[in-house]
C-alpha cells in the first residue's frame, strides 16, 4: 500500500482463471449431460413425451446415469478398520455390508421399505440435439444413382474475399491487415485510420451436387390385434424415420399406408394419430404399395424403400400372397424392411412365411421392448462403407 497526496493505493494480484470457474463447470456439466444422453439413446428415442411432442419444444427427460459427487455421512454406522495384517491380495474381500441384504431395490416388494431410492436428474434437451446424435449414425442403405437426377444446394461455403459486401460479413482480420499495409506504405506504423477501401468482406458460394431421388413407403398394421404397445412402437419407429429422412435428404418422398383387411394411402397426420380395428390381411398393404410404385415412382428414376411394421398376426391363408408380393416389391426396390413388434416371443404367422427368404434386400427386425426402436433404426439404416452421393 502506498500513499500519494493523501490518497491510498493498493496493489494486488489475483488468479483471473478463477473468474472462468463457473463457465468451466457449466461446460463440463453440459458435456456430462451430452455423454449421458448418448449412453441412454435407446431409452430416450422411445420416450413418450418426445414421440408425442411437436418436434420443436425443449423437453425434460430423466437421466439416471448422471452421477454427481457429494459428501455424505456413513449412515450404516459401522466400525471401520484402517490397517490390515499385511497379507491381503488384490481381489480379496475385506468386508461385507451387514445391512446389504436388507436393502430393497426398485422392484415390486411386499411392503414399504426404509431405504433411500435412486436419484436421477432431469435434463432439458431439444429434439434437434437428439437428432444430431441419432442421425449421425444413420443413412439410406444401398442408395444408387438413377437416370433422372435433380440439382439441389448442398451447402453454403464462405470461401472468397471481396471489397464490396454486407457489413455483417466484414472480415475484421483482413480489414485490419489491409489498413496496416496501406499505412506502412505511407510510412506510418499505425492501424488507424481505416478507410472504406480497406474493408474486406467474406462472400459465399453455393455448392451444388446431383442428388438421387428416393421414396420411402411406410406401411403399418392398424388391425385389432395391434395393441397399444404395438402401435406405439411402430409409430415411434416411423416418427424418427420420417424426421431422419427429412433432415438428411432433400429429395426423399414419403408415402404412408395404413391397413387392416384393406389398405389405403393416408395423410401423415392420420397415420400417426388415428387407430382402427378389424382383421389382418397384410397382402393388401403390399398390393397398395405396388400400385403406388407403378403409378408414381419408376424404379429407374427412384430408389425405393418399403417398410412394413406389424405384430405378425396375419391371416394364415394370406401368407402365400404376402410372400409373392414381397418378392415383387423387392424386384422394384433397393431394400424391403419388415419390423415385427413381438413383446412375448409368441408364434408369428407372418414371420414363419418370411424366415426362408434369402434375398439380401429383405431385412427384418423383431422388437420386444421400447429400447429396440433405436436398434431397429440402426439396423435398417446402417451406414455402408461407400455411400452413393445423396
Swiss-Prot record:
Q: Which residues cross the membrane?
A: none
The entry sums up its family as follows: Belongs to the UPF0229 family.
Q: Give me the stretches of Basic and acidic residues compositional bias.
A: 22-31, 86-100
Biased composition annotated in UniProt, kind: Polar residues: 7-16
Q: Please name the NCBIfam families in this protein's record.
A: spore_yhbH
User: What is the name listed in the Swiss-Prot or TrEMBL entry for this protein?
Assistant: UPF0229 protein ABC1477
Say which domain of life the source belongs to: Bacteria
Where are the stretches annotated Disordered? 1-31, 81-118
